[in-house]
Amino acid sequence: WKIIPKRRYLGNSVLSLLTKIASGYWHVADSQTGYTAVSLHVLQTINLDQIYTNYGMPNDLLVRLNVYGFRVRDVVIRPIYNIGEKSGINIAKVVFTMSFLLLRLFLWRIKERYVIRDFHPLVFFYAFALFLFIIDIPLSIRVLYVFCTTGSVPPINFLTTLFVSTMGVLFLLFAMWFDMEESK
C-alpha cells in the first residue's frame, strides 16, 4: 500500500470491498491486481461470452466462479507504479458503471446460488435488511425534521427509528456472515 498512489489505493480498496460483497469471496484481498488462472473444467462450465469485457471483468468472473462453487485462491503480487504509465480510466464513469455492475452481479449471485441452485436462509436476512432500510429512510427523515423544527424528538419516535436501523444493520451483517461461511 505504500507504493500505490493514494487516490488509486482508496478507489481500489472500495472496489475490492464491494467485490467481496458481490462475489462472496471474502478472502480475496485485491480483485483488480494480479492474474487469473483457471482450470479446463472452469472454462467448460462458465459461459465466457457472458462475462463483462471491460474493467469489471475480474469482478464478473469472481461472481460466476462463486455461483458454480469453484474455489479461488488469492495470489499476492507486487504491483509496479509510477513508471510513466497514464491511466485512461474516467473515474466518474467507472464509479457509476462498476457500482451498477456489482449490484447486478450480487443480486444475480444471490438468486442463482441461494434460491435456484440450493436454498439458504440468508436470502431472508438480506430481504429483511432491505425491507428495514426502506422503512428506516422515512423514519429517519421524520426524526431529523422534527428535531430541526422543534428542537427535540419524542422518545418513541427516536427509539423506533433506532430499533429499525439497528435491526436492519444486524440482518445485513448476519446475511453477510452466512454468505462468508457458505463461500469458504
Where are these regions (language model features)?
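Acceptor/aglycone-binding surface of glycosyltransferases and processive sugar-polymer synthases
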Residues: 1-55, 81-96
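Hydrophobic helical membrane-anchoring modules
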Residues: 50-184
